[in-house]
Amino acid sequence: METRATLRGVRLSVDKGRLVADLIRGKKVDQALNILQFTQKKAAVIIKKVLESAIANAEHNDGADIDELRVKTIFVEQGASLRRFTARAKGRGNQIRKPTCHVYVTVGN
């Protein structure tokens, strides 16, 4: 039994998200939440919310026991980049790319 939760279009770079996702892959859910709580990264807060959503989905939809759940898969994929322009000298402009990503978490026995 597997349950998924996704979060799309997060204002976070893929590399920073994957750094935190690698910390909890394959761990028990309570251990993963503990790791995320004490990790001082912006990505940890975002991934913790998605993980809590996946746990709630498993409990509500499938009646799963929380003590037996593990983080089966977690991956962070690249989303569309937001493009912004900033003014430069002599009437020119430079492009600023603000990356987004998609977070996918699957929990199961």
Curated annotation (Swiss-Prot):
Task: Please give the superkingdom of this protein's source.
Answer: Bacteria
> Quick check: keyword Ribonucleoprotein in the entry?
yes
Gene Ontology terms, cellular component aspect? cytosolic large ribosomal subunit
Give the matching InterPro entries.
Ribosomal_uL22, Ribosomal_uL22_bac/chlpt-type, Ribosomal_uL22_bac/org-type, Ribosomal_uL22_CS, Ribosomal_uL22_sf
What keywords tag this UniProt record? Ribonucleoprotein, Ribosomal protein, RNA-binding, rRNA-binding
Pfam families found in the cross-reference section: Ribosomal_L22
Gene Ontology MF terms in the entry: rRNA binding; structural constituent of ribosome
A single BP term in Gene Ontology: translation
- Which protein family is named in the record? Belongs to the universal ribosomal protein uL22 family.
Q: How does it assemble?
A: Part of the 50S ribosomal subunit.
Q: What does this protein do?
A: This protein binds specifically to 23S rRNA; its binding is stimulated by other ribosomal proteins, e.g. L4, L17, and L20. It is important during the early stages of 50S assembly. It makes multiple contacts with different domains of the 23S rRNA in the assembled 50S subunit and ribosome.
The entry's protein name is Large ribosomal subunit protein uL22
Name its species. Albidiferax ferrireducens (strain ATCC BAA-621 / DSM 15236 / T118) (Rhodoferax ferrireducens)
